[in-house]
Every structure is written in C-alpha cells, then in structure tokens.
Amino acid sequence: MLTLKRIQQCKLLNTIHTTYNTSLVFDIIDMARTRTYIAGEWDGDLNAIDQLYRWNEGDKWNMHFTDAHKNGQCYDTSMPCTIKASLSERLGRSKTFILVVGNNTNTTRKGACSYQNCDNKQFNYFTGQFSCKVIGKSYSTESFIDYECRLAYNAWLRNEMKIVVLYNAASVNRSKCPEKLRNVGTHVEMKSYNYNWQEYRYDYQKVKKAIEG
C-alpha cells in the first residue's frame, strides 16, 4: 500500500521527468530551426555565393541557407522598405550570419529608400516628416547590406547571432567590409593558392572552419 509520503515522491519524480522531456523537446525544435543567413553584393560576388551553395548541396555541410538575394525579381520590383521587412523576418530565424565581401560591398547603395511613388509612406504630423509604415521609422538611407549588417550586429550583441565575414579574395581587407561588422565576428579570406592548379582557388577547408568553428 502506498503511503502519503511515497505518493508525494512519485508525483515529484513525474513532475521532474515531464519538465526534463519538455525542455528536451524545445531544445530539439530550436536546433531544427537553425538557419544560416547569407548576405552579399549579388551582382559582384555571385561566384562566391554560388560556391557556398555548391559545397552545401554536395553533402559537405548540413546547413539551411537563407539567401535573401535569391529571388532577384523581388529585389528589382518591390519597394525597399517592403524588402527590408522581409529581410528582418528571415534574419530573426537565423543563428549564423555570413557576409560575403567583395570590391563593391561597402559602397553599394542598392536598397536605400527614396520614397518615390511609394504606397508605404505616411506623413507624421507630430514630427512633420514622412515615415515608413513597414519599418516604422523615417527616411532610410541604408542599403540592403547596411540594413542586414545592422540587424546582425544587434543580434550579435544579444548573443543571438554568430557572424562570419568571408572575403571573395585571397586576403582579408577589412576596409571593404561595412563598418558595422568590421571589428566583430570571424573574418576569413575564401581563396588560397593551389599549387596543383597553379592558381588561387576557393579553399573549402578554410571556409568550413570559419563557419563551423
């Protein structure tokens, strides 16, 4: 016959067991939703971004890439503030932020809002300025890359984001990196000299170590 004390002990053990399993389930779900976000100057560094995809699709990695620039038509036809809202949502599901840096990364202005023929602007009578209904602030001069870097940096400050900066070159030149990420995260060149091919080629092991390390 179970005593009152024994019944209480059983209830306590069952509570601990249930709590542990619930926590474990949530940990597994969180891991399953991990994303790796790729940003870069699509026009100039397509070769480097494509190389990351080839490595991942070749079963070398097991990452869920979120490439904000994959749908080029969306970038050409949608309003910048609408796109930035989508970028913010995608970044919110990501644990790792990869920025591919090339010659034009720090100077491109694609994505800077101009509020020309935009249906998402509204006049704020308190400030006397137009503001964006999507991102909730006034005129934005940030490019898409600047916007992504700022969000990634803020997430990094909260210990929610790992930042990896990959240079589409054989050396690291931080002056080409947007200032927001210039001194944070891991900075690695993507290319090394291959003596067999007698040329600079993308270095899988070096990039893998930077992303997974």
What do these predicted regions represent?
Residues 105-155:
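Conserved TIR/SEFIR loop-to-helix hotspot centered on a Trp-containing motif
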Residues 45-48, 106-110, 171-178:
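Short catalytic/ligand-binding loop motif for oxyanion handling, primarily in non-cytosolic enzymes
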Residues 51-54, 112-115, 178-181:
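Short, glycine/charged-enriched secondary-structure capping and boundary segments
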Residues 2-4, 10-97, 101, 208-213:
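Conserved N-terminal substructure of TIR/SEFIR domains
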Residues 102-104, 168-169:
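Beta-hairpin (beta-strand-turn-beta-strand) motif
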Residues 155-163:
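A short helix->loop->beta-strand "cap" motif at the edges of active sites that frequently abuts
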Residues 26-30, 35, 167-213:
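C-terminal interaction surface of TIR/SEFIR-family domains
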Residues 98, 162-166:
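Hydrophobic/aromatic beta-strand patches that form the interior of the parallel beta-sheet core
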